[in-house]
C-alpha cells in the first residue's frame, strides 16, 4: 500500500480552518502556532499538487479542490472517531462517552431526568447532551456526531431515508393559567372559552406552535382569532409570564411538573380536546451503534411512560 499524501493531523487542521474561519483562530483552537498551520497547509498543497485556498482572498476561502478535500477529509475523521468508539466499547462499558441529541423542550425537561437514571446505573460512562432544533439534531445523527436523539419535531425530508425514526411516546400539551385567573377554579373549560383568554405563545415557526394550531383547527377552533398577548422564544419565559398573570399558554406537561406540584400554575383541560405530539427516537443504522447507546435505549428509554410520570 502506498503512503497517503496527507496525514490525519493535516485533515484536522483543514477542519479547524473551515470551522474557525481563519488560520489564526484554527491554530488557537488546536493549541499550535499559526506558522505551524501555514506550513502544514503548504506541505499538503505540495503533496497533492493542488491549491487548497484562494490566495487572492484575505480570508480562508477554499478552492473547489480544497472543498473536495475538506468534504472527504471530514468523512475520514468521522470514521476514525467511530473506530475509536468501537474499540472503546470492547472494554465492556468500563468507560467512554455517550452523546445524546435532543430538541429544545425535550432536552431541557425530559432528557436530564433520564440521563440521571442512566448515570446512576452506569457512573463510569460520561454523557454529553446536545440541545438544538430538531433539524440540527437530525443532521448530527446523520453525520455520526451524536449516538441517538429524542426529538419532538419533524425530521427533515432529505434525511428520513437515512435515519431510523421510531415513535417514542406522546407528549401532551397542556393549557396553563395563572393561579388567580377565574378559570383556575375549573378543571375543564369549553372550546368557546378559549377566545376569552389572552395567550402567551412561542413564535409561529416553532414546532409546538404548529402542532397546537393544527389540532385546535381540527376541532373547529380558529386559533387565528386568539388574543395573543406576546410571543416569546423560550418555554421558561412563557411559564414565568403565565405565573406573573400575563396570560394563558400551551406548554408540554413535561415542562410544568414542578410548577404543578408546587401549585404555581393551574392546568385546565378543554372539553373534547386533547393536544398531543409524538416524540421520536432517531438513530443512524449505517453508523456503528455503541453499547452505551443500546443500553440507554433498552433500559432507560423504555422506563418512560409519560412525561408527567417521570
Curated annotation (Swiss-Prot):
InterPro entries attached to this UniProt entry: LysR_subst-bd, Tscrpt_reg_HTH_LysR, WH-like_DNA-bd_sf, WH_DNA-bd_sf
GO cellular component: chloroplast
Coiled-coil regions listed in the entry: none
Molecular function terms, GO-annotated: DNA-binding transcription factor activity; transcription cis-regulatory region binding
Places the protein is found: Plastid, Chloroplast
Domain called HTH lysR-type: residue spans: 6-63
Database matches in PROSITE patterns: HTH_LYSR
DNA-binding region: 23-42
Chief location category: plastid
Gene3D superfamilies, per database record: 3.40.190.290, Winged helix-like DNA-binding domain superfamily/Winged helix DNA-binding domain
Record keywords, A-Z: Chloroplast, DNA-binding, Plastid, Transcription, Transcription regulation
Family named by the database record: Belongs to the LysR transcriptional regulatory family.
Described purpose of this protein according to its UniProt entry: Trans-acting transcriptional regulator of RuBisCO genes (rbcL and rbcS) expression.
Protein name (database record): Probable RuBisCO transcriptional regulator
Natural source organism: Guillardia theta (Cryptophyte)
Lineage: Eukaryota, Cryptophyceae, Pyrenomonadales, Geminigeraceae, Guillardia
Amino acid at each position: 500500500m502506498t503512503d497517503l499524501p496527507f496525514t490525519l493531523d493535516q485533515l484536522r487542521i483543514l477542519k479547524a480552518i473551515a470551522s474557525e474561519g481563519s488560520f489564526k483562530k484554527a491554530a488557537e483552537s488546536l493549541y499550535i502556532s499559526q506558522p505551524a498551520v501555514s506550513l502544514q497547509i503548504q506541505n499538503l498543497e505540495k503533496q497533492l499538487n493542488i491549491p487548497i485556498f484562494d490566495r487572492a482572498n484575505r480570508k480562508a476561502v477554499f478552492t473547489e479542490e480544497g472543498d473536495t478535500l475538506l468534504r472527504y477529509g471530514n468523512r475520514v475523521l468521522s470514521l476514525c472517531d467511530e473506530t475509536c468508539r468501537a474499540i472503546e466499547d470492547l472494554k465492556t462499558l468500563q468507560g467512554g462517552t455517550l452523546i445524546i441529541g435532543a430538541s429544545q423542550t425535550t432536552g431541557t425537561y425530559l432528557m436530564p431526568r433520564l440521563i440521571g437514571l442512566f448515570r446512576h446505573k452506569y457512573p463510569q460512562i460520561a454523557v454529553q447532551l446536545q440541545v438544538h432544533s430538531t433539524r440540527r439534531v437530525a443532521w448530527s445523527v446523520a453525520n455520526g456526531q451524536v449516538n441517538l436523539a429524542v426529538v419532538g419535531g419533524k425530521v427533515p425530508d432529505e434525511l428520513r431515508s437515512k435515519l431510523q425514526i421510531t415513535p417514542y411516546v406522546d407528549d401532551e400539551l397542556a393549557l396553563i393559567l395563572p393561579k388567580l385567573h377565574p378559570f383556575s377554579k375549573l378543571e375543564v373549560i369549553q372550546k368557546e372559552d378559549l377566545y376569552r383568554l389572552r395567550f402567551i405563545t412561542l413564535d409561529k415557526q416553532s414546532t409546538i406552535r404548529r402542532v397546537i394550531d393544527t389540532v385546535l383547527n381540527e376541532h373547529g377552533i380558529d386559533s387565528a382569532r386568539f388574543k395573543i398577548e406576546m410571543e416569546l422564544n423560550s418555554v421558561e419565559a412563557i411559564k414565568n409570564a403565565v405565573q406573573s398573570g400575563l396570560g394563558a399558554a400551551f406548554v408540554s406537561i413535561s415542562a410544568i411538573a414542578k410548577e404543578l406540584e408546587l401549585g404555581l400554575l393551574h392546568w385546565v383541560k378543554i372539553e373534547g380536546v386533547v393536544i398531543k405530539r409524538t416524540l421520536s427516537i432517531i438513530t443512524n443504522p449505517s453508523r456503528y451503534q455503541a453499547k452505551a447507546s443500546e443500553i440507554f435505549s433498552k433500559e432507560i428509554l423504555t422506563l418512560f411512560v409519560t412525561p408527567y410520570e417521570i
